[in-house]
């Protein structure tokens, strides 16, 4: 199927289909492409992968962290693709320019790349991202390889709140949402803080927090847990002991393999329960 053109509503091909073999027994070879998805504000380049054969497959949105799209995230999308999901990894920074990416020192405070990323990141509020989620929902509804019906969404760092917000904004479509070391999930000064919408969620939520995280300090985690329980939200808030913000990223200094593998186990189990 190399070179096959996918054309859905509002989409155009940006490259030939490629294939990526699964790394473990029972995993599928995935087909991958980068497509443009039409949004209210332009076109959003989106990495898409799914098993090469069979289908249709349940849909999952993998929402990027602040440093943006990179091969590390594509590999994470591929891992989900090899176990049977139709995965979309959108460049949420598309409003700042096509193929907006940052150099290796993007996480170094005081660097030019960090400043450039922050200038874009601070404009990434929940409402426009929810419009992007809506655009992706419309797109997958026109794709033969994408299973109709409920979808999943998960995010890391800045996108943890986006995934939870998506479950509240689209409660009849987003059946599972997960946040991994999501930032400021409780912000009492922000009207759009994710904790305010727990009661609108119909799907299952999973919220994983790192013990050492300046962007989600322990008092906030405890407050979040209490709010979550009082709202009667289906799901779980889990604290990962000893690890730091970013623990699931293999190329990050704080990568912790046992915690990262637990995050995969929790995420895939969530999607199996809710999406199949």
Predicted segments with their positions:
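N-terminal cap/leader regions of alpha/beta-hydrolase-fold enzymes
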Residues: 5-13, 19-276
């Amino acid at each position: 199927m190399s070179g096959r053109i996918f054309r859905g509503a509002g989409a155009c091909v940006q490259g030939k289909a490629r294939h990526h073999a699964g790394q473990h027994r029972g995993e599928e070879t995935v087909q991958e492409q980068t497509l443009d998805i039409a949004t209210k504000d332009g076109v959003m380049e989106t990495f898409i992968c799914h098993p090469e054969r069979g289908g249709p497959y349940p849909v999952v949105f993998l929402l990027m962290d602040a440093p943006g799209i990179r091969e590390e995230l594509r590999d994470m999308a591929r891992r989900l693709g090899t176990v049977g999901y139709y995965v979309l990894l959108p460049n949420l920074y598309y409003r700042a320019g096509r193929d907006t990416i940052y150099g290796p020192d993007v996480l170094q405070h005081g660097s030019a790349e960090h400043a450039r990323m922050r200038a874009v990141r601070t404009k990434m509020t929940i409402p426009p991202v929810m419009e992007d989620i809506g655009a992706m929902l419309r797109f997958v509804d026109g794709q033969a390889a994408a299973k109709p019906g409920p979808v999943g969404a998960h995010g890391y760092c800045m996108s943890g709140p986006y995934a939870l917000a998506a479950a509240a904004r689209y409660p009849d479509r987003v059946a599972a949402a997960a946040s991994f070391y999501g930032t400021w999930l409780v912000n009492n000064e922000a009207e759009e803080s994710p904790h305010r919408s727990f009661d609108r969620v119909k799907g299952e939520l999973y919220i994983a927090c790192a013990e050492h995280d300046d962007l989600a300090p322990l008092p906030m985690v405890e407050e979040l847990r209490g709010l979550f329980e009082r709202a009667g939200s289906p799901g779980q808030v889990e604290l990962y002991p000893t690890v730091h913000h970013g623990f699931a990223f293999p190329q990050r200094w704080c990568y912790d393999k046992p915690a990262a593998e637990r995050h995969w186990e929790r995420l895939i189990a969530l999607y199996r329960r809710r999406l199949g």
